[in-house]
């Protein structure tokens, strides 16, 4: 979002923020307006609940396509991945559905040429940084270093307090295919989420204090009780 706002100011454009979630996400939309977004749309309906990345990308692609019909889009910005599912699939899924060129793991926008309809992007890989030129409109999934989050100026703060985000539902303005939304449109279901159990602290034995033989016997006893010796010796 910070990168989108930065380039909006350079090119005298507009930024529209789209989010899919429960009604209380209205607060998040207002925060986006505080940062400089011009328009905010919350896509919210109980029928969208339980959506996996496939169903989510369908809904967002339909909404972004509708926005594009109202006011042509040059760049679509996504984060690299969500902090819950951590899949990094929704951005690429939207790009495929909208038939947009995509650059993932973007760390810098070098140039945007609206006359020649191209954008030049730096993207980070595990081994190096690539510089890629793609035609506009294009979709980017962005690393956090693509831009610094700016301090919101006072006029934007006041505007955000007064702003009423748009709420798009199953009732409109987009007509969604009920077979592709929510649980029905999701081939994957998360049954459980949790944090991994922390391993117990190990026991420390000082061989100098109890002697090598005692320390070795202690270690072998622990290994036998844990079944490690059976694995090493093949059950012998």
Regions found by a protein language model. Give the residues of each.
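N-terminal glycine-rich FAD/FM-binding segment characteristic of electron-transfer flavoproteins
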Residues: 1-236
């Amino acid at each position: 979002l910070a990168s989108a706002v930065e380039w909006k100011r350079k090119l005298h454009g507009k930024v529209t923020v789209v989010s899919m979630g429960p009604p209380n996400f209205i607060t998040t939309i207002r925060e986006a307006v505080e940062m400089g977004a011009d328009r905010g749309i919350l896509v919210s309906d109980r029928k969208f609940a339980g959506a996996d990345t496939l169903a989510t990308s369908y809904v967002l692609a339909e909404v972004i396509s509708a926005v594009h019909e109202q006011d042509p889009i040059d760049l679509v910005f996504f984060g690299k991945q969500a902090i819950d599912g951590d899949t990094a699939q929704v951005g690429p899924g939207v790009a495929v559905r909208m038939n947009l060129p995509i650059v993932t793991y973007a760390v810098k926008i070098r140039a945007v040429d609206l006359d020649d309809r191209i954008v030049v992007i730096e993207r980070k890989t595990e081994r190096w940084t690539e510089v890629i030129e793609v035609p506009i409109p294009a979709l980017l999934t962005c690393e956090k270093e693509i831009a610094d989050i700016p301090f919101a100026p006072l006029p934007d703060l006041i505007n955000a307090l007064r702003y009423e985000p748009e709420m798009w539902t199953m009732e409109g303005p987009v007509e969604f295919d009920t077979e592709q939304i929510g649980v029905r449109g999701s081939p994957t279901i998360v049954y459980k989420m949790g944090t991994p159990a922390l391993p117990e602290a190990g026991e420390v034995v000082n061989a100098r204090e109890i002697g090598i033989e005692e320390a070795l016997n202690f270690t072998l006893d622990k290994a036998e009780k844990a079944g490690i010796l059976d694995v090493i010796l093949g059950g012998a």
